[in-house]
Amino acid sequence: MKFWTVQKYATLNTVLKQGIYQPDFSKSWYASQGEDNADFYDCVRKYFNHANETGYPGLVFAFAQNKTNKYIEEFTSYVEFYQFIGSSKNAIKSLWKQIATPDACVLELEYDTTLFNPLFIDINDFQALMPPVMFMPPYTEENLHKVAENFYNGVIAPSVFPSYLIQAHAPFIKRENIVGVYPIFDI
C-alpha cells in the first residue's frame, strides 16, 4: 500500500546512504516539544509495538485517505495527494505549518501492510487524542475513550468527526519503500 509522508531531506539522505531510516522518538525534535508531547508520542510508539508485537524506538508518520469513512485507500499520485491535502486544510493546517519546512520533501512510500498493522486513524481523531485532551463536540469522553481503545488495538473504526485524511504509521523507511520524491508545498 502507498503511504505519503513529509520528511526532511536529511532523512531521505540517510535512507539513500545507509539503506534504511529507523526513527527514534528519543532523538525526535517534534516528539520532544514538551513533556506531554513526548509522553503522547511514546504512547503511540507503544501502541504500534503492542499491535505488531515489535519493539521499534520510533515511527514514520504518513498519510492515506478514506473517502467514505469505511475503507482506507491510497493516494495514487502526487497530484491527488496535493489536492487532497489542500482540501483538508482545516484538519491539517497546524501540523502542516510545522512539518512543511524548506528542508522537507514529500515521499511516496510503498509497504506490504500484510507484514504490519499501520494503526490507521483519522487525523481528527488523532489530534483529539493529543494533549491536552479536551472533550469538545462532537467528541465525548465515551467516544474518545473508544477511539483510544481502537487505536491501541490497531482497529480502524469510522470517525465521529471524519476528515477523511488518514494517518498511518510505519516502522522505518527502507530504500525499497521509496517510490517517489516530490517537493514540499504550502496549503
Model-derived segments and their meaning:
Residues 10, 23, 56-58, 67-187:
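Conserved NAD+-utilizing ADP-ribose enzyme module
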Residues 3-5, 61-63, 108:
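A structural signal for short, well-ordered beta-strand segments and their strand-loop junctions
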Residues 1-57:
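ADP-ribose/NAD+-binding catalytic cleft of ART/PARP-like enzymes
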Residues 53, 63-65:
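Short HxH-centered metal-ligating active-site micro-motif
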